[in-house]
């Protein structure tokens, strides 16, 4: 497995996570009509992909700490309620680290983990917002108008960014 080689350049992990976090907001602001309409809401989850990728390939790195810190940053910039995404990202990192030892190391497994992470995070946030009466959507509307389109968008984004980030992971081990 990749993690048996020596790891260098770990300082790039928070830098890449920060760039992915900024890209999440950039995509929504640069193309607002494409991501939000009356029929659907598309939410890019590039930062979440970063957490899945780095937790999968670098299980000994302090990803829980990064998840909490970047989750708080994400909350302060995007959601306005501190702690929601911090908890969600930390749970995803824990989940990926626990699942990683049972799974084969390939692109399809990583894609599946990413899709499961999207479902977990978006469902958690939806449930929290529903409990707090922040959203008026019912679960079927959430699933059809937000979760489904979000998964499709993020599969496309996964196809676009997987190879460059995988090469970065390889470089970090050299």
Say what each PLM segment does.
Residues 1-174:
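Terminal, non-globular segments
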């Amino acid at each position: 497995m990749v993690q048996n080689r020596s790891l260098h350049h770990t300082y790039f992990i928070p830098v890449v996570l920060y760039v992915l976090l900024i890209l999440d907001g950039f995509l929504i602001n640069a193309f607002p009509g494409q991501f939000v309409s009356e029929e659907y809401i598309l939410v890019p989850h590039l930062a979440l992909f970063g957490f899945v990728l780095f937790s999968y390939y670098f299980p000994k790195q302090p990803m829980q700490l990064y998840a909490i810190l970047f989750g708080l940053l994400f909350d302060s910039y995007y959601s306005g309620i501190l702690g929601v995404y911090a908890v969600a990202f930390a749970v995803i990192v824990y989940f990926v680290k626990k699942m990683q030892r049972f799974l084969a190391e390939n692109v399809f497994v990583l894609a599946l983990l990413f899709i499961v992470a999207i479902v977990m995070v978006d469902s958690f946030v939806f449930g929290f917002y529903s409990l707090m009466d922040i959203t008026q959507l019912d679960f079927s509307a959430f699933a059809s108008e937000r979760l489904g389109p979000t998964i499709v968008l993020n599969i496309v984004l996964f196809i676009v960014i997987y190879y460059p980030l995988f090469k970065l992971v390889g470089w970090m081990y050299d």
